[in-house]
A protein has these predicted regions:
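Ubiquitin-like/PB1-type beta-grasp interaction modules and other compact soluble beta-rich domains
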Residues: 1-88
Length: 88
């Protein structure tokens, strides 16, 4: 199983889990399973077509990837939502 590492706010939506173990052969499958296991995350990472949202960066073993990238069973997947703010 791949290890999926979560940052805020996703960590909060996953009940405070910093990392979860998830099966899947592609990034898309892993993220769909993440949403299935943690329904509060649904809509934050994947859009209605199953694609990674533009404001979310996904890295597999340190390489930025999209939803069709392969995921080995020993991979580490980082899911990083972009952080933005308003004017000062």
């Amino acid at each position: 199983m791949a290890i999926v590492k979560l940052r805020a706010p996703l960590r909060d939506l996953a009940g405070g889990s910093r990392e979860v173990s998830i099966d899947g052969s592609s990034v898309g499958e892993v993220l769909q399973e993440l949403e299935r296991q943690h329904p509060r995350i649904e809509g934050w990472v994947l859009d209605e077509h199953g694609r990674v949202r533009r404001h979310v960066n996904v890295f597999v073993n340190g390489e930025r990837v999209r939803e069709d990238a392969a995921v080995a069973s020993d991979a580490t997947v980082h899911v990083l939502p972009s952080i933005s703010g308003g004017e000062r």
